[in-house]
Amino acid sequence: MLKTELRKAKALKKTQIKNEGERTMVKKATAPAPTNEVGNLIRKQREAMHMTVTQLAGLVGVSRNTITNYEAGKTEPNSSDLVHISGALGCSINDLLHGGIASIPPRFAFRAHAPLRKDQAITVVARKYLRAYDEIEEIMNSRLSGTLLTFNTDQEGPLKDEFIKMAADTLRKSSGLHDSGPENIASVLEGLGVRTLFFEHDGKGIEGLSTIQGDMKFVMLRNRRKEGKLIERTIFSAAHELGHLVLHPQLFTSEDLDEEKDSKRHEAEADKFAGNFLVPEDELVRVWVEERLSKHKLFDALILLKRVFHVSFHCLYRRVTELHLHHSLDRAIFVNQIKERLGINGPATMDQLEPDPLPPDALYTTNRFSRLVRSASLQDLIGVSKVAEMFQVTVNRAKEITTDWVTPKIGPIEA
């Protein structure tokens, strides 16, 4: 079947001779070069994913020259080669050769996610999840309702604080965050029209990422609950990525971008959006005044606020100082105060500098995608191998997952 697909792809682009009357008289020296449709398609997908030839070769497990020769039409990939290449690009062979909605590479905010340029494996994982999400919605005939609001502004350069606050407040009011709580941030984003799921990642620099494919808005969050690490960072990352989707649609492009242009500003604006979204001004000021938190030392006041808003200590510090409820402290002095209260000597990570961390199990990682896959499996609409493909796990792991679905856990039985 793959050989047939290759023949179809090669036939997509035929050479046309300008002078129809001299079709049989064309000189050999001026004959058009052989078409290279498959190589062009590989190159197009690679460039759209912002991969270098070397990066793609590394993911496929071949030499750089092999990929170069494929793209130049000097050699032709066989069926097995295409399986590995399409997998490395995060698409199916059919998508690679014939196009369609699923073949359109997702658009990442590369300027806002600099580590993506170095770790292309993450973008491939994201693309596979996007394709799986689109497929399971089609199988279940269940499309995510609601469309994420965007806010247009004519201003050039940095966004005004008032504009960022307005956007965050508007979305917060329609999100149900107040009732659901930030621990259920995945459900909150899905309620706003953003497909959300969790991924596992051992590297540094990526806590979450946002991407767009067609009309689909998508956020992937690092599964810190499974790692037993600070989930406050996951919550803030989710709101931060929402900020990029809402405030910076121009970042999500497949075109070449300036490496560092305005990246710090965009990150600062997304951080400001996240702070306003998670800790709204009116509610923060009300609690601060009603509970007379100004009477406390800053450390104790922030601990009390954390019991209200369930976000990170440092997010609350930024909000309190932004709103001039307390004066800003020199970072070194503030960190030393935290260390003193926590009994920490020597260097410390940001996770270690978080007083009273939320328990990892408090984060709800169940999401719409996993529920749809489970529902399809229980209805025998998909098999174990498809579950493995969609979850990007081994077949043996998928068997364990589907077995657990059939035999749910029960609570303790009283004697």
What are these regions (language model features)?
Residues L2-A415:
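Active-site hotspot residues in diverse enzymes, especially metal/ion-binding acidic/histidine motifs
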